[in-house]
Curated annotation (Swiss-Prot):
Record flagged with keyword Ribosomal protein: yes
GO biological process, one term: translation
Organism: Nautilia profundicola (strain ATCC BAA-1463 / DSM 18972 / AmH)
Keywords, comma-separated and alphabetical: Ribonucleoprotein, Ribosomal protein, RNA-binding, rRNA-binding
Stored HAMAP family: Ribosomal_uL23_B
Subunit structure comment from the entry: Part of the 50S ribosomal subunit. Contacts protein L29, and trigger factor when it is bound to the ribosome.
Function: One of the early assembly proteins it binds 23S rRNA. One of the proteins that surrounds the polypeptide exit tunnel on the outside of the ribosome. Forms the main docking site for trigger factor binding to the ribosome.
Protein known as: Large ribosomal subunit protein uL23
InterPro entries linked to this entry: Nucleotide-bd_a/b_plait_sf, Ribosomal_uL23-like, Ribosomal_uL23/eL15/eS24_sf
Length: 93
């Protein structure tokens, strides 16, 4: 079962901020979280039932540092459509 600690961060890019005006929140999580689990997290911790949840898997970038190749961890990104009357004060910019 997923919980609030599986949410790594809220994404604040230019695209994400434009989507936020339309009521869509972009969330980065661990790869094991599913759409239904994320809906339950939003219901339990934020008291909001998402209207729609879209997800995508993102591969971690391969990076080099002083000739040694490393890899950033893989993650999952969710686009969460919230109701118009929903306000998440703790998550807004």
């Amino acid at each position: 079962m997923a919980d609030i600690t599986d949410i790594k961060s809220i994404v604040y890019t230019e695209k994400a901020l434009n989507l936020q005006e339309q009521g869509v929140l972009v969330v980065q999580t661990t790869p094991k979280v599913t759409k239904n689990q994320l809906k339950e997290i939003f219901k339990e911790y934020f008291g909001v039932t998402p209207l729609k949840v879209n997800s995508l898997r993102q591969k971690g970038k391969v990076k080099r540092f002083r000739g040694i190749e490393g890899k950033r961890p893989d993650y999952k990104k969710f686009y969460v459509k919230l109701p118009e009357d929903a306000k998440l004060e703790s998550l807004s910019v």
